[in-house]
From Swiss-Prot:
<dbReference type="Pfam" id="PF00958">
    <property type="entry name" value="GMP_synt_C"/>
</dbReference>
<comment type="pathway">
    <text>Purine metabolism; GMP biosynthesis; GMP from XMP (L-Gln route): step 1/1.</text>
</comment>
<feature type="binding site">
    <location>
        <position position="481"/>
    </location>
    <ligand>
        <name>XMP</name>
    </ligand>
</feature>
<comment type="function">
    <text>Catalyzes the conversion of xanthine monophosphate (XMP) to GMP in the presence of glutamine and ATP through an adenyl-XMP intermediate.</text>
</comment>
<dbReference type="InterPro" id="IPR022955">
    <property type="entry name" value="GMP_synthase"/>
</dbReference>
<dbReference type="InterPro" id="IPR014729">
    <property type="entry name" value="Rossmann-like_a/b/a_fold"/>
</dbReference>
<feature type="active site">
    <location>
        <position position="186"/>
    </location>
</feature>
<keyword id="KW-0436">Ligase</keyword>
<feature type="binding site">
    <location>
        <position position="536"/>
    </location>
    <ligand>
        <name>XMP</name>
    </ligand>
</feature>
<dbReference type="GO" id="GO:0005524">
    <property type="term" value="F:ATP binding"/>
</dbReference>
<keyword id="KW-0547">Nucleotide-binding</keyword>
<dbReference type="GO" id="GO:0005829">
    <property type="term" value="C:cytosol"/>
</dbReference>
<keyword id="KW-0315">Glutamine amidotransferase</keyword>
<dbReference type="InterPro" id="IPR001674">
    <property type="entry name" value="GMP_synth_C"/>
</dbReference>
<dbReference type="Pfam" id="PF02540">
    <property type="entry name" value="NAD_synthase"/>
</dbReference>
<feature type="domain" description="GMPS ATP-PPase">
    <location>
        <begin position="211"/>
        <end position="419"/>
    </location>
</feature>
<protein>
    <recommendedName>
        <fullName>GMP synthase [glutamine-hydrolyzing]</fullName>
        <ecNumber>6.3.5.2</ecNumber>
    </recommendedName>
</protein>
């Protein structure tokens, strides 16, 4: 049987991103409805797609549709013959293509608004709001975020919702399944928004809602076995984080001991991390694991380096070098076994496992237009450039919460599935300044105390990510009767659904007091603790 691609396994909704801060939420809402969807940049040429979507959603955008540099969709999308939903800018783009008028409006709408649904009496035109219960006053609360709006309907379109200041809040084509809404149904501030999206993807597009982690496991295991064959071997880097652990366990379930995990100790891991990961993967999960201690090499190359991008490149390049050397040993052993045992031996090592997630893919997309690469992700690209291996990424289509759900279904213990994310470059990007053994030891100790206190307070599972950053500043303090001049650490904790946006976590004051007291008393060289209360955006989760 030929390898089945995901689009042949699941009906797919195509989301075309025009750079909206909410675009990823459209994807999340579809996934929550057990509908598979994929987001691509708005510049995507439809003729280049190897698959046909069941429907298309056009996202919002910070641009004005009539601006000279405004992004525009490939007109071929309207010849696919599938349902289309435009959200905010997407509505305006539909109007532009079909001959409507969009202008800057004197009364901009930002925040909550109440829309009135207009029934046309025709099933296809009314489908977007069909079955949605209105509020007591007959309206529907939604979230607006637009300065431009549709001022004249395109030919053959009708109004299906309005507000006092926006007469064309939602529109539908008279005879084709093309819809547009000026509000944002994907955000939580539109209470019935998910139902609007459900009406489009399920009722209008008739998508089969087969996307779930329960259905994903057997299909992905079958796909892996088909790719690797009966004897093909796979190597993969693991860190002890959720992504690589779940990927390793899934691979082990598919091909057993033909999967070889490699952990590279780069010297900037969490306290005792290498020992903990070795036990976790080998004893608890039964995965073949080799741990390579390359800390001396990494730290030597990081000496004197302060720039975060240089740190990333040094760690990334050194990791590749060390990983390739260890992989070569495993490949040589496989070749030797093949020569000695012939047909009874396992096959060659042909594949490289990576735990890439869908947010990595989204944030790594770079194109001319409203979206741009936010930062280089260590999971995307780089490792295969010098290796004669083919890439296998079983988690590439998944969000973090889906990966955790997958891990639970694979019977990975909760304390492993629930671990907070840890960056590929490790503590090097949590040390603002030069990375030295002394700085690493300080940060490891402070971070260990912080996480211990968060767990003790019963808050760990309520927080999406928590860590300590070591700042490149010193502050005056008092210890006993003596003046101190020591370093400052920042503690960070965020809550998020998918790490595309995040809010800072509100700790009880007594917990923060305990954290600060323990760190300043127990960590030599630190006399001040600050708490980071920055959301994403405008900040990122990590400091560097």
């Amino acid at each position: 049987m030929a390898t089945e691609e995901i689009h042949s396994l699941y009906d797919t909704i195509l989301i075309l991103d025009f750079g909206s801060q909410y675009s990823h939420l459209i994807t999340r809402r579809c996934r929550e409805l057990n509908v598979y969807c994929e987001m691509l940049p708005c510049t995507q040429k439809i003729s280049d797609l190897s698959w046909k979507p069941k429907g298309v959603i056009l996202s919002g955008s910070p641009y004005s549709v009539y601006a000279p540099d405004a992004p525009h969709v490939d007109p071929e999308v309207f010849t696919l013959g599938v349902p289309i939903l435009g959200i905010c800018y997407g509505l305006q783009e539909i109007a532009r293509v079909h001959g409507g008028t969009v202008d800057a409006h004197t009364h901009r709408e930002y925040g909550y608004a109440k829309i009135e649904v207009v029934k046309t009496g025709k099933k296809e035109q009314d489908a977007l709001f069909e079955g949605i219960e209105m509020e007591a006053d007959g309206g529907l609360q939604v979230w607006m975020s637009h300065g431009d709006q549709l001022t004249s309907l395109p030919p053959n379109f009708v109004t299906i919702a309005s507000t006092p200041t926006s007469p064309y809040t939602a529109v539908a084509h008279e005879s084709k399944p093309i819809y547009g809404v000026q509000f944002h149904p994907e955000v939580s501030h539109s209470p019935k928004g998910k139902e609007v999206i459900a009406a489009f993807v399920k009722n209008v597009c008739s998508v089969r809602d087969g996307w779930s982690m329960e259905s994903f496991i057997p299909k992905e295991i079958a796909r892996i076995r088909q790719i690797c064959g009966e004897k093909g071997q796979v190597i993969g880097a693991v860190s002890g984080g959720v992504d690589s652990t779940v990927a390793a366990k899934l691979m082990h379930e598919a091909i057993g001991d033909r999967f070889h995990a490699i952990m590279v100790d780069n010297g900037v891991l969490r306290k005792d991390e290498a020992k903990k990961v070795h036990k976790m993967l080998t004893v608890d999960l039964g995965v073949n694991l080799t741990v390579v201690d390359a800390s001396e090499l990494f730290l030597a190359r990081l000496k004197g380096v302060e720039d975060p991008e240089r740190k990333r490149k040094i760690i990334g390049n050194t990791f590749i070098e060390v990983f390739e050397a260890e992989a070569a040993k495993l490949e040589a052993a496989a070749e030797k076994e093949l020569a000695e045992k012939g047909g009874e031996a396992k096959g060659k090592i042909e594949w490289l496992l990576q735990g890439t997630l869908y947010p990595d893919v989204i944030e790594s997309i770079s194109f001319k237009g409203p979206s741009a690469t936010i930062k280089t992700h260590h999971n995307v690209g780089g490792l295969l450039e010098d290796m004669k291996l083919k890439l296998i990424e079983p988690l590439r289509e998944l969000f973090k919460d889906e990966v955790r759900a997958l891990g639970r279904l694979l019977n990975i213990p909760e304390h492993l599935v629930g671990r907070h994310p840890f960056p590929g470059p490790g503590l090097a990007i949590r040390i603002l300044g030069e990375v030295t053994r002394e700085q690493i030891a300080i940060l490891q100790h402070a971070d260990d105390i912080y996480i211990e206190e968060v767990r003790a307070a019963g808050l760990y599972d309520q927080i999406s990510q928590a860590f300590v950053a070591l700042l490149p500043v010193k502050a005056v303090g008092v210890a006993g009767d003596a003046r101190t001049y020591d370093q400052v650490v920042a503690v960070r904790a965020v809550s998020t659904e998918d790490f595309m946006t995040a809010d800072w976590f509100v700790f009880p004051p007594q917990v923060l007091k305990r954290i600060s007291s323990r760190i300043t008393n127990e960590v030599k060289g630190v006399n001040r603790v600050v708490y980071d209360i920055t959301s994403k955006p405008p900040g990122t989760v990590e400091w560097l």
